[in-house]
Amino acid sequence: TEFPGLGFRGRPAVGLKLESKGWQFLCIRVNNGSLLFSLRELDNQLVVEDTFDFPKQNSDAFLHHFLAAIDTFFQRYQSRVERLTAISITMNAIVDPISGVIYSSPYYAIQDIPLADKIQEKTGVAVFLQHSVTAWTMAESLYGAAKNNTDILQIVIDDIVGAGVVTNGKTLHSNSHSAVEIGHTKVIDSQTQCYCGAKGCLETEISIPQLIKKAQHLAQENPTSILNQYPITVETLCDADRKSVV
């Protein structure tokens, strides 16, 4: 869409604005046990959102049920879908954003799934796969707290341990799925096996589920601990830490 720009001398400038009405993209967030679908206009206006149960499955069943969920979404909301331009998929997993392959996941027993290619074959639109932490960092660099910064490091400790890096304005992954997988850096000799296949990963030591397990063990060894007064959650753990009571 063209609109006139105000000029003081010479020929008036003509600005351009993206016409987003009817042009859409689909966001799919892979959670632990569910898929969140969000259909949006190119200006990020939400059209429709829905959540589908997605139980733990092996690699073959994962891909089959993922494609089936996409079918169900389009059938359910076919009257709301217009000109679909792309599909984005984010998840907590070891992924290769270049090839669109999921290597492994903390939530599902899957390995080496070419998810982006399979969905693109089915839908005919471009598909982008990215680790949720990296996608979050990209969003912060474009629209959030880190806007206008060219060098960004974001570290997230949640169900997973991950990092998003932007250097000189570009997202760092160096054509590799493991460039900033800090959660899978070996930090300790341990028999605890990570879903990536290795042992002693940082994620097996400091992710929130692991911290809660350690707190539960610590509470059992200390009957007078404040942690024994409530169910141990990340909130009660943080509260105990603020009070410096173990």
Q: Model segments located where?
A:
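Gly/Thr-rich phosphate-binding beta-strand-loop-beta motif of the actin/hexokinase/Hsp70
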Residues: 12-49, 154-167
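Short small-residue beta-strand/loop micro-motif enriched in glycine and branched aliphatics
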Residues: 47-50, 194-196
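Glycine-rich phosphate-binding loop and adjoining helix at the ATP-binding site
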Residues: 50-151
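A mobile "lid/hinge" subdomain adjacent to the ATP/sugar-phosphate binding pocket shared
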Residues: 202-246
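Nucleotide/phosphate-binding catalytic cleft detector across ATP-hydrolyzing
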Residues: 1-16
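Hydrophobic "anchor" residues
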Residues: 46, 102, 171-172
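Glycine-rich phosphate-binding loop of actin/hexokinase-like ATP-binding domains
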Residues: 148-205
